[in-house]
Structure formats: C-alpha cells, structure tokens
C-alpha cells in the first residue's frame, strides 16, 4: 500500500491564493455580466442634464464583502470638469480671463500666475480677495544693491536716480559725477535741440517711465498665443461667441469700500449638525390610567414554599394608643408593717451615726421610743408578726424573758 503524499508548502500556498482570489474573480465576472446587461439600458436612458453632469452606476463590494451598486457622477461626453463645472472640451478656459494677470491651461485646469515684478499671494486668492498679485518692492529686498544712489519702486518694477551733481549712465543703475547738459541755457533736463513748432519734449524721468511701460508691454505680448483670433472668444452656455476682448491691464489701487449690496436669495438648507448634549430631565408627568388586569388563568400555581428566615428588625414605630383596662385580679394576702419599720430603724441608726461624727456622742431624743397605737398596746410582740397565719408560731418560739424592743 502506497502512503498518501504529504501536503507540500506549495499546495497550501495555492489553496490560500485560491481563497483570496475567489471574491476578486467573482466581482470581475459579475462586473462583466453587469456591464453586458446594463450597458444597452444606460445608453438608452443616459440623458445629459442642463449642468452637463450625468450619473453612472457600477458594481462594487462593501467592507463586509457583500456585492452592491455604487454611483459616480461625471461630465457628459464632449465636456470636461473645470473650476466646479462641466465645459466643452474644445473651449479655452482662459478666454474669460479668470485670472488677475496671467492664465495657463494646465490640462484642463486653470493655472494663475503673476507678471514679473509681482508675487502670488495664495491666501488672498483662496479668500477671493483682490489683488492677489502683489507688487514686489525690489528696492527693499535688494538691500540697496540695485542702484548706485537712489532706488524708486514702481508697480511691477523700479528705476534708479542719482543725487545732485551726478548723471545716470545708460545701464540705468550707475551714477557718474558730472553735468549731463553742459551747454544748458536755462531749462532743466530738456533736449539739447531747440524745441520747434510741431515737436514735443520730455524729461528724463518721463522718458524712463515710458521705457519701463514699453518693456512691460513686450513681456505681456510674449505670453500671448500666436493665433490672435483666439483672443476674442468667450463661452456663453454651450455656444462659443466672438467678442472684442482685450488683455487686462495691471491692477489699479484698491478703491474705497462701496455701499453694501442687497441681500442675496436664501440658500438651501445645510446638512444636519451633530446632535447636541442631552438636556436636563424634565418634571415627572402625572400617572397614567391603570391598565387592564392581566389574565393569569394560564399560569400554574405551585405549592406554597417553606417560610423563610425572619428579616431584619424594622425601626421602632410610634407609641400606640392605651389599651382597654383588663379585668380586676384576685385579692392578695394581707400586708405587713415590718418593712416600713425596718426602713425607719435604718434611718434612726444613720442619724445616730451622723450625730456621733458631728458632736462626738449620740444625743438622746425625747421621741426615741415610738408610740404605739392603743389597739396594739396589749400586744408586746406586734412588730414581729408578718401575717395572722404565723403569729401563733412566732410567739411560741420567742423567749418570754427576752427584752421587749421594737427595733432590731
């Protein structure tokens, strides 16, 4: 008998790979089936909305591995998504001059840049604040290395000037000692030729400003497209019309704050916010009506169980009302004065001891012998009996010669 072959690591790896690729192959197969089934219907019912956005659906897997349907929005055929809207693919996105200075079509995205001499402020651009192309102060950033004497900053550029007694060289930076107009007859910084009729003159400062302006225009024209016909096009809905559009000039100084505009239309309601913290509990409501008694006929009642142990004693309650008097009891035996006489004898002895301690001897009291009632005078042993039953026995036992003393 040939033993079965041992499972190899390669076989286990293949089984593990088959388990992991199983859901993926199932998704691909269902995706092809879905596409084959839904594609004709999607083509028939795909309608491009006014905003040129269409919605497509496709099969996808949830995190639990369950197959579901996902939706995706895209621009209609022949349109591309730029700046939050769908525009025609052949439309020049820079035709409406969306940028403050320079605009570049970066694969369907608007890329705004600034002219030389300006810096781009991203934060102001994101807040839609203008101008966001800010002038660079070359005189402040150059640390007085641009000009030999005086540096004057201008919008997008700068120019140099010399102190009195110096002239500016052709490079526009260097200053040389000397007089620029040695044969000057009275007018300052004018042309050496005499001004004639039909001619005009300008100072060196005015000429330098015009030169700087021409230089800026050359830089702007170098950035324009070669086809001048494309400069005057702009988009209006789905139609591309032609107009006499011009390049925007350099931004002017910000004006004063205008009057507040009229309030805009009411916006759509936003998304519901997060639930707030729970409030304080309200007062307790009144008790509702009693419900119907439950039907306990189907419940089987067993025998009563044994009595449990006594519980802990409760608190003492209030004193109850006085009960009704009970029936009178049977009469007791006759009383005796023996106990009272014993108490009086103890008091007499205590008084005698107190007198002995205070006076040093006992004082004789005139009332030392207590008088007896007359009905007891004929009975010398009256104080010895307790009741009538034992009187005869006590008198017989006492010695007749003993002294008669009423106190023990």
Curated annotation (Swiss-Prot):
Matching Pfam families: Collagen, FXa_inhibition
Ranges of residues in domain Collagen-like: 247-292, 302-335
Principal location class: secreted
Keywords, comma-separated and alphabetical: Angiogenesis, Calcium, Collagen, Developmental protein, Disulfide bond, EGF-like domain, Glycoprotein, Proteoglycan, Repeat, Secreted, Signal
PROSITE patterns: ASX_HYDROXYL (PS00010), EGF_2 (PS01186), EGF_3 (PS50026), EGF_CA (PS01187)
Pro residues bias spans: 272-281, 325-334
Entry coiled-coil feature ranges: none
UniProt region (Disordered), positions on chain: 246-335, 361-408
Molecular function terms, GO-annotated: calcium ion binding; collagen binding; protease binding
Biased composition regions of type Basic and acidic residues, renumbered to the chain: 390-402
Family: Belongs to the CCBE1 family.
Protein's name in the database: Collagen and calcium-binding EGF domain-containing protein 1
Organism listed in the record: Mus musculus (Mouse)
Lineage summary: Eukaryota, Metazoa, Chordata, Craniata, Vertebrata
């Amino acid at each position: 008998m040939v033993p079965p072959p041992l499972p190899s690591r390669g076989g286990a790896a293949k089984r593990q790979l088959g388990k992991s690729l199983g859901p993926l192959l199932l998704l691909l197969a269902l995706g092809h089936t879905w596409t084959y089934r839904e594609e004709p219907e999607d083509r028939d019912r795909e309608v491009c909305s006014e905003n040129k956005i269409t919605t497509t659906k496709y099969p996808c897997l949830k995190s639990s591995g369950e197959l579901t349907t996902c939706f995706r929005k895209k621009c209609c055929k022949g349109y591309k998504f730029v700046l939050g809207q769908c525009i025609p693919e052949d439309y020049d996105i820079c035709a409406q001059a969306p940028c403050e200075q320079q605009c570049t079509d970066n694969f369907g995205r608007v890329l705004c840049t600034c002219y030389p001499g300006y810096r781009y402020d991203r934060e102001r651009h994101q807040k839609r604040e203008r101008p966001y192309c800010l002038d660079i102060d070359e005189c402040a950033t150059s640390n007085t290395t641009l000009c030999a004497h005086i540096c004057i900053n201008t919008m997008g550029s700068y120019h140099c000037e010399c102190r009195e007694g110096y002239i500016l060289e052709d490079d526009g930076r260097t200053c040389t000692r000397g007089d620029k107009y040695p044969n000057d007859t009275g007018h300052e910084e004018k042309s050496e030729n005499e001004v004639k009729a039909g001619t005009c003159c300008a100072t060196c400062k005015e000429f330098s400003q015009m030169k700087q302006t021409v230089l800026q225009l050359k830089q702007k024209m170098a950035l324009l497209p070669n086809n001048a016909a494309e400069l005057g096009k702009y988009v209006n809905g789905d139609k591309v019309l032609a107009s006499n559009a011009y390049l925007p000039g350099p931004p002017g100084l910000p004006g004063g704050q205008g009057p507040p505009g009229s309030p805009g239309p009411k916006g759509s309601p936003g998304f519901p916010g997060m639930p707030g913290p729970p409030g304080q509990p309200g007062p307790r409501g009144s008790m509702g009506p009693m419900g119907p008694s439950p039907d306990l006929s189907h419940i089987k009642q067993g025998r009563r169980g044994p009595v449990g142990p006594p519980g802990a004693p409760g608190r003492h309650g209030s004193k109850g009302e006085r009960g009704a008097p009970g029936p009178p009891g049977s009469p007791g035996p006759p009383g005796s004065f023996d106990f009272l006489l014993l108490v009086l004898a103890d008091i007499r002895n205590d008084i005698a001891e107190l007198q002995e301690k205070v006076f040093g001897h006992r004082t004789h009291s005139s009332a030392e012998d207590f008088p007896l009632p007359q009905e007891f005078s004929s009975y010398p042993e009256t104080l010895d009996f307790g009741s009538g039953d034992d009187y005869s026995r006590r008198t017989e036992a006492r010695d007749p010669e003993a002294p008669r003393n009423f106190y023990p």
